[in-house]
C-alpha cells in the first residue's frame, strides 16, 4: 500500500502563495492519516478547504485545521468530535513534520500543526502522522506572517486542498 499524498494551496490575504504537499503515514497511523486525508478532500461534506492557519510561531510551528470556529477552539474529526491517540511511534524529528494538535490525551479532532523545527518535547503527547513532501519553502514563507504569541499579521488560508495520490 502506498501512503496517500494530499496538498494545500496556501493564500495570504487571498493572494496565492503556493502549494504544500504532504505524505500521510497510513502505514503507521492509518486512522489518523485517514482523518486528515478525508478532511483534505472534503468528501464527508466538511473539511479544511477555506480554513485558516490561526496560530503561527516562527521557529516552532504553523497550526491550522479549525474549520468550525477558526480560532483554535473548534474543529471535528471524521469519526465524530474527538478520537483517541492512535500511537506515538513517530517522533517530532525536525522541520516538515505533520502532527495532531490536541487539548490533552485522546482529544484529536481536525487541528494539526506543521513543525518548522525539531520539537522533541511533543513526543508521546502529539500523534505524528505525516511530513511535508514538497513546498517546505511555502511553509517557511508562512512563518514570516507569524509572531511569538502565534497571532498572524495576515490571513493565511487553505484556498484549495485535496488528494494527489
Curated annotation (Swiss-Prot):
Glycans are attached at residue 108. InterPro entries: Cyclophilin-like_dom_sf, Cyclophilin-type_PPIase, Cyclophilin-type_PPIase_CS, Cyclophilin-type_PPIase_dom. It catalyses: [protein]-peptidylproline (omega=180) = [protein]-peptidylproline (omega=0). Changing residue 121 to A: 200-fold decrease of sensitivity to CsA. Reduced ability to stimulate MAPK/ERK phosphorylation. Changing residue 69 to A: No effect on peptidyl-prolyl cis-trans isomerase activity. Reduced interaction with BSG/CD147 and ability to induce leukocyte chemotaxis. The modification N-acetylvaline is found at residue 2. There is a cross-link at residues 28, 82 (Glycyl lysine isopeptide (Lys-Gly) (interchain with G-Cter in SUMO2)). GO terms for molecular function: cyclosporin A binding; heparan sulfate binding; integrin binding; peptidyl-prolyl cis-trans isomerase activity; RNA binding; unfolded protein binding; virion binding. Interacts with protein phosphatase PPP3CA/calcineurin A. Interacts with PRPF19 isoform 2 (via N-terminus). Interacts with isoform 2 of BSG/CD147. Interacts with FOXO1; the interaction promotes FOXO1 dephosphorylation, nuclear accumulation and transcriptional activity. Interacts with integrin ITGA2B:ITGB3; the interaction is ROS and peptidyl-prolyl cis-trans isomerase (PPIase) activity-dependent and is increased in the presence of thrombin. Interacts with MAP3K5. (Microbial infection) Interacts with HIV-1 capsid protein. This is Peptidyl-prolyl cis-trans isomerase A.
Amino acid at each position: 500500500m502506498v501512503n496517500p499524498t494530499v496538498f494545500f494551496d496556501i493564500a495570504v490575504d487571498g493572494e496565492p502563495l503556493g502549494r504544500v504537499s504532504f505524505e500521510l503515514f497510513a502505514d503507521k497511523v492509518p486512522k489518523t492519516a485517514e482523518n486528515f486525508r478525508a478532511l483534505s478532500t472534503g468528501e464527508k461534506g466538511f473539511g479544511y478547504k477555506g480554513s485558516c492557519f490561526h496560530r503561527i510561531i516562527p521557529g516552532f510551528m504553523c497550526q491550522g485545521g479549525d474549520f468550525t470556529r477558526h480560532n483554535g477552539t473548534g474543529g471535528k474529526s471524521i469519526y465524530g468530535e474527538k478520537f483517541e491517540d492512535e500511537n506515538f511511534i513517530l517522533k517530532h524529528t525536525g522541520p516538515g513534520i505533520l502532527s495532531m494538535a490536541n487539548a490533552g490525551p485522546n482529544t484529536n479532532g481536525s487541528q494539526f500543526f506543521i513543525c518548522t523545527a525539531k520539537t522533541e518535547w511533543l513526543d508521546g503527547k502529539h500523534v505524528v502522522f505525516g511530513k511535508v513532501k514538497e513546498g517546505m519553502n511555502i511553509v517557511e514563507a508562512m512563518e514570516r506572517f507569524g509572531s511569538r504569541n502565534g497571532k498572524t499579521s495576515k490571513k493565511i488560508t487553505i484556498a484549495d486542498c485535496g488528494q494527489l495520490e
